[in-house]
Amino acid sequence: MEAKLKTFFAEFGLSIEKEKIQLFERYYRLLISENEKYNLTAVTGEDEVIVKHFLDSTAVLIYRDLTDLNAVDIGTGAGFPGIPLKIMVPGLKLLLLDSLKKRCLFLERVVRELNLTNVTVINERAENLGRQKPFRELFDVTFSRAVAEVRVLLEFHAPLLRLGGETILFKGPGVDEELKKAEKAAKQLGMELKDVYYYRLPGNFGERSLVVYKKLQNTPENYPRRPGIPEKRPL
């Protein structure tokens, strides 16, 4: 796996040191060994996991530096993009948020076995966490690879993001229609579309995009709405 990691990361324009390679190898072994128990991912082949999960998660680093930032990964699942970003940027302070207890148990094991510091795992819905004072408007940057519309994701992210912070959403190449639908939500939540970065994964694994919003105003106190409402009645 070491040679593949080096090759794929180099093709993506990122260098990777031996210690980080070893962490990715351990993460892969945990992901595969615990997959059946926790139902973590449908992607299990070595090349696919390296490119579609590990490498894709680190696409943010082509766009910006994350050193010493306070970040939350919303709907992290098996730890993407949060854990690959933490491996690549040890100085990142990270909260991994997921609503499923079994996934959080897996994440706690990964954090423990990889000896990752300044990483917290919380089993909670974003709609609830966004209403808790210790977390509201706390984070410098928020991420999500979760499968949901942009306008829905913005309601999860904006309440947790500090003024001037950035929300980075991982999307496919055809995101224009979603962005148009999200214009009203962004305005109501104090967010503004900053940029969309398109990129291609190596090994013919397809095109992706990073959608970046900046927070310009405080999010009104009535957001986020109750759990389930953002998906049922998007802004």
UniProtKB/Swiss-Prot annotation:
SUPFAM superfamilies recorded: S-adenosyl-L-methionine-dependent methyltransferases
Pfam families found in the cross-reference section: GidB
Record-listed E.C. numbers: 2.1.1.-
Compartments, as annotated in UniProt: Cytoplasm
Parts forming coiled coils: none
Stated family: Belongs to the methyltransferase superfamily. RNA methyltransferase RsmG family.
Record's protein name: Ribosomal RNA small subunit methyltransferase G
Organism encoding this protein: Carboxydothermus hydrogenoformans (strain ATCC BAA-161 / DSM 6008 / Z-2901)
Lineage start: Bacteria, Bacillati, Bacillota, Clostridia, Thermoanaerobacterales
Gene (name only): rsmG
